[in-house]
Regions:
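Aromatic/acidic polysaccharide-binding cleft in carbohydrate-active enzymes
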Residues: 1-14, 26
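Short coil/turn segments at secondary-structure boundaries
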Residues: 21-31
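Feature captures the RNA virus RNA-dependent RNA polymerase
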Residues: 10, 29-30, 39, 112
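A broad, low-specificity signal for short, low-complexity segments enriched in glycine/proline
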Residues: 9-16, 40-42, 95-98
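C-terminal beta-sandwich/jelly-roll accessory domains of carbohydrate-active enzymes
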Residues: 57-139
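Carbohydrate-binding surface patches
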Residues: 31-74
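Alpha-helix capping/termination and helix-coil
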Residues: 11-22, 76
Length: 139
């Protein structure tokens, strides 16, 4: 039953983001650590975006580089929401690798497109072979 619930969850997530995924502009972000991959899709009108950050292996560095998101409208404001995550504690206790998770992971945050492109999102240290899915909605 747990497996079926997982399929239902991801089918609903795909339906919610289908237009962006199939009609948006794809972006790949350069990450300084080769063990981390980041890519996303931004809607043609730049109103929505979805980004995936994948941790392939143990990171080479103790601190993760910020995720600077591409393709957004600099003057717009976006609500950043964590759509999916591995089994890490989303309670303010950072699990076994961190004492505290970035604030946007526990509470949706609203920030400018320029800030997301220049400063970026602080990333958690993820376990190897895991990923997080991030949604953005212009407000």
């Amino acid at each position: 039953e747990e497996e079926r619930a997982g399929y239902r969850k991801y089918a609903a997530l795909h339906k919610q983001w289908r237009d962006v995924i199939h009609h948006g502009v794809q972006w790949r972000m350069d990450m300084p650590d080769a063990t981390t991959l980041a890519h996303g899709v931004v809607s043609p009108d730049k109103a929505q975006a979805i980004f995936l950050v994948s941790q392939l292996a143990m990171p080479d560095y103790t601190l993760m580089a910020p995720l600077r998101l591409a393709g957004l409208e600099a003057s717009a404001r976006y609500q950043v929401t964590l759509l999916d995550h591995p089994n890490i504690q989303i309670t303010g206790e950072g699990g076994h690798t961190m004492r505290k998770l970035p604030a946007w992971m526990t509470t949706p945050q609203t920030v400018s497109g320029e800030w997301l492109q220049q400063a970026g999102l602080a990333l958690p240290i993820l376990d190897p072979e895991s990923a997080i899915l991030i949604g953005l909605q212009r407000v």
